[in-house]
């Protein structure tokens, strides 16, 4: 605030003493009036007032006496003799309030002087500019709308404890403008993706979150129990098989933005509950899906950042240029030019090299699986600018259509940006007999100890037997997309309430 050197601070008490003092204040308020009134009607947001009147000079603005009603949380406060200043914060930003005994009664001033930082207030008055040019509301009436019983983090230190930041997101959102902006951007990104899909004539749908058979991805599911039916159910690991059932049913372009759940480890890139978009288009293929993914990401960046050339962790990322396309072997060789074709097709050599790069050997010992594991160890993390890795082995792509021209490979891609996977898609396998055989192979892998291998889904095979048209499909991780476009370094910074160990 321009008129103040230091905001009001709490007395030098510990948190429990401060809470007790504030509870006593609340008790006194209850004796006099409704402590939590709900009849104040705000008519203005801080950001709108700054946008409309912020550039108008004091001489022009003050005589107009423009009336406003604002409300928000009190973040700064200072008494100056018979006058007081305060700054309140709403969802859009902050605005300053000015009170003196000419504008409000002494009783109102006395009440105001007993209020604390963090209290939620509603103020009515007229706009003016201070001598320092700050847009301010000259208050004619102000009311306490909600008493804050707990003190806010120190304004200058902020909420620096990461554990508290994630457990008490409500405090983080109050104290940290950066966090508020991240989650506002998250909403805008999701809306941008949704608008883009609708513009491409896709139909938004909702499919089950609890599945009788887990499927659509290779991952460990969460298991629950339906009491009335007395059956196990699985929180979905992916919506894929239900969405493709809809394509069988004639809904030729469908998408879903929703949660999926995977009972696996947590990291800076992984949360067991996460948001993704999956979309499917009949009479399409993985080439079209790659272009869709590219356009979705580029459009979202332009929407929230005004550009498709962004910075992540201090390094430029080019989302504007056409995304590069490499096969798994091409990517390995790009960053390890000393590897030979002979070595990359030698199972024993691959196993040794995989271990050397700190990766685990895949459950399936095929050449394709080994090449993929080596790629993950020696090339994936180096793919900074967006790169499609294409033509994955059949053995690691149980739902993708086999290539007509490249034996043992599928029409599948994964998109990598800043060294991490962002999207996965393919030309869908639409041969029911081939799909049944691949499901059986997955069951064999599961029996051999691969917990993440897929189950056999007989109803999905039945749906395919009615005829699934040639179809392209793609999934994009929304949380990782938000991380990329907001320059966030951990997934916990873009999920409002990330999974945490119990306190």
Swiss-Prot record:
GO molecular function, one term: tRNA binding
GO cellular component: cytosol
Top-level taxonomic group: Bacteria
Keyword Isomerase: no
Chain sites annotated for binding Mg(2+) 2: 421
E.C. numbers: 6.1.1.6
Cell compartments where the protein resides: Cytoplasm
Family assignment from sequence similarity: Belongs to the class-II aminoacyl-tRNA synthetase family.
Sites where the protein binds Mg(2+) 1: 414, 421
Assembly information from the UniProt record: Homodimer.
Coiled coil regions, renumbered to chain: none
Pfam families, A to Z: tRNA-synt_2, tRNA_anti-codon
Catalytic activity: tRNA(Lys) + L-lysine + ATP = L-lysyl-tRNA(Lys) + AMP + diphosphate
Keyword Metal-binding applies: yes
Keywords: Aminoacyl-tRNA synthetase, ATP-binding, Cytoplasm, Ligase, Magnesium, Metal-binding, Nucleotide-binding, Protein biosynthesis
Note accompanying the cofactor annotation: Binds 3 Mg(2+) ions per subunit.
Name under which the protein is recorded: Lysine--tRNA ligase
Cofactor: Mg(2+)
PANTHER family, alphabetized: LYSINE--TRNA LIGASE, CHLOROPLASTIC_MITOCHONDRIAL, LYSYL-TRNA SYNTHETASE
EC category name: ligase
């Amino acid at each position: 605030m321009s008129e103040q050197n230091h905001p009001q601070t709490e007395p030098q008490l510990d948190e429990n003493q401060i809470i007790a003092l504030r509870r006593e204040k609340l008790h006194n308020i209850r004796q006099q009036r409704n402590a939590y009134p709900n009849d104040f009607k705000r008519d203005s947001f801080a950001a709108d007032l700054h946008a409309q009147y912020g550039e108008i000079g004091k001489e022009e603005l003050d005589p107009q006496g423009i009336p406003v009603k604002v409300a928000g949380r009190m973040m700064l406060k200072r008494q100056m003799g018979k006058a007081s200043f305060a700054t309140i914060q709403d969802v859009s930003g902050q605005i300053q309030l000015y009170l003196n005994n000419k504008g409000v009664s002494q009783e109102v001033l006395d009440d105001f002087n007993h209020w604390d930082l963090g209290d939620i207030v509603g103020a009515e008055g007229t706009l003016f500019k201070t001598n320092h040019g700050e847009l301010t509301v000259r208050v004619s009436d102000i009311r306490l709308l909600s008493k804050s019983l707990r003190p806010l983090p120190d304004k200058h230190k902020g909420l620096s404890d990461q554990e508290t930041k994630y457990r008490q997101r409500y405090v983080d959102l109050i104290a940290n403008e950066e966090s508020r902006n991240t989650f506002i951007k998250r909403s805008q990104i999701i809306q941008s993706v949704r608008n883009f899909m609708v513009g491409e004539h896709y139909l938004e749908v909702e499919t089950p979150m609890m599945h009788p058979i887990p499927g659509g991805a290779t991952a460990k599911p969460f298991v629950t129990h339906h009491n009335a039916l007395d059956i196990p159910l699985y929180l979905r690991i992916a919506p894929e098989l239900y969405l493709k059932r809809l394509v069988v049913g004639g809904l030729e372009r469908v998408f879903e933005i929703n949660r999926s759940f995977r009972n696996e480890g947590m990291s800076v890139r992984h949360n067991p509950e996460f948001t993704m978009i999956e979309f499917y288009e009949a009479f399409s293929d993985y080439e079209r899906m790659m272009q869709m993914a590219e356009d979705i990401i580029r459009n979202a960046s332009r929407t929230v950042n005004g550009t498709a050339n962004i910075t992540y962790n201090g390094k430029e990322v080019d989302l504007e240029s056409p995304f590069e396309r490499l096969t798994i072997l091409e990517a390995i060789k790009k960053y390890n030019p000393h590897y030979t074709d002979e070595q990359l097709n030698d199972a024993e050599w691959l196993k040794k090299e995989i271990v050397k790069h700190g990766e685990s050997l895949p459950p399936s010992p095929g050449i394709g699986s080994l090449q993929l594991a080596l790629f993950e160890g020696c090339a994936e993390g180096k793919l900074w600018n967006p790169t499609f890795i294409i033509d994955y082995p059949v053995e690691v792509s149980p739902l993708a259509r086999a290539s007509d021209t490249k034996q043992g490979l599928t029409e599948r891609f994964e998109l990598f940006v800043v060294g991490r996977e962002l999207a996965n898609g393919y030309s869908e396998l639409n041969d029911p007999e081939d799909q049944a055989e691949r499901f059986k192979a997955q069951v064999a892998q599961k029996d051999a100890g691969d917990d993440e291998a897929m189950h056999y889904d007989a109803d999905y095979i039945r749906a395919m037997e009615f005829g699934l048209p040639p179809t392209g499909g793609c999934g994009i991780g929304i949380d990782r997309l938000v991380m990329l476009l907001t320059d966030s370094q951990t997934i916990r910074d873009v999920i409002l309430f990330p999974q945490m160990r119990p306190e």
